[in-house]
From Swiss-Prot:
Lineage: Bacteria, Pseudomonadati, Pseudomonadota, Gammaproteobacteria, Candidatus Pseudothioglobaceae
Gene: folD
Stretches assigned to coiled coil: none
Protein name per its UniProtKB record: Bifunctional protein FolD
Keywords: Amino-acid biosynthesis, Histidine biosynthesis, Hydrolase, Methionine biosynthesis, Multifunctional enzyme, NADP, One-carbon metabolism, Oxidoreductase, Purine biosynthesis
Keyword Oxidoreductase belongs to the record: yes
Protein family membership: Belongs to the tetrahydrofolate dehydrogenase/cyclohydrolase family.
Quaternary state and interactors: Homodimer.
Length: 277
């Protein structure tokens, strides 16, 4: 069993990005919009801001009050779309319930959509002609590359069908010529499907759902979930302590997929910058 150190892999990627940024005349610019005062979202935004500063990006944090209207938010995005200093735009999700997240995502220029959620970027990913790829699934693909996994012909099961992780992850694996099964909350006999998998990627938001006896010995298990238990402990969707006994590679939570998601975000910002040159 090998534990995948996402922090170390991400640190190496950030160091390479910084070398590229140091040679540029203008620093890539990232704008992050946070609506409201959700504590978890504030932590995520702060982590992204710190990562940007570490690699030498220009970082702009925009805090909007929780009662911000749809029109006000769209106007802010339009200003950033037209700004020469800003190469990437990120609106921190989830948004307050009175705001339409889909409308907000579609308002971001596809060329500055560093989250990779705009329908144009999702369409390019599905056509295997990606430009800005969704960050979590891209970060997972970076992990596979770093640990030397050949995905061609591998049986891969993605547990979770969200637009943020599950669906883009399935597309990434298909583009890598893997054989992909995507499961959701209605999937019957999930454990039987997982027992056939060479690679399992989980993102369902259910703490420690995936158990040791669901996993084929020697498989690779990627945990993209993050949950907080009653005792304040952060855990993933995989029962790490038991599954690590049978997996050949496994990501911890925290310290696995999370740092890689931010590394992918930084790389997307650099790609967006280079696309304007």
């Amino acid at each position: 069993m090998n534990i995948i150190d996402g922090k170390q892999i991400a640190q190496n990627l950030r160091a390479n990005i910084k070398l590229k940024v140091d040679a540029l005349d203008r620093k890539p610019g990232l704008a992050v919009i946070l609506v409201g005062d959700d504590e978890a979202s504030e932590v995520y935004v702060r982590n992204k801001d710190n990562a940007c500063k570490e690699v030498g990006f220009y970082s702009k944090k925009i805090n909007k009050p929780i009662n911000t209207t749809q029109a006000e938010l769209l106007s802010e995005i339009e200003c950033l779309n037209n700004s020469d200093k800003i190469d990437g735009i990120l609106v921190q999700l989830p948004l307050p319930k009175h705001l339409d997240a889909n409308l907000v995502i579609e308002a971001i220029s596809p060329k500055k959509d560093i989250d990779g959620f705009h329908s144009e970027n999702i369409g390019k990913l599905m056509q295997n002609k990606p430009f800005l790829r969704p960050c979590t699934s891209k970060g997972v693909m970076m992990i596979f590359e770093m640990i030397g996994v050949n995905l061609v012909g591998k049986n891969c099961v993605v547990v979770g069908a969200s637009n943020i992780v599950g669906r883009p992850m399935a597309c990434e694996l298909l583009n890598a010529q893997a054989t992909v099964t995507i499961c959701n909350s209605k999937t019957k006999n999930l454990s039987n499907k997982l027992k056939q998998a060479d690679i399992v990627v989980v993102a369902v938001g259910i703490a420690q759902m995936i158990q040791k006896d669901w996993i084929k010995p020697g498989s690779i298990v990627i945990d993209a979930g993050i949950n907080r238990l009653d005792n304040n402990q952060l855990v993933g969707d995989v029962d790490f302590e038991s599954v690590m006994q049978v997996a050949s590679w496994i990501t911890p939570v925290p310290g696995g997929v999370g740092p890689m998601t931010i590394a992918a975000l930084l790389e997307n910002t650099l790609i967006a910058y280079e696309g304007k040159i």
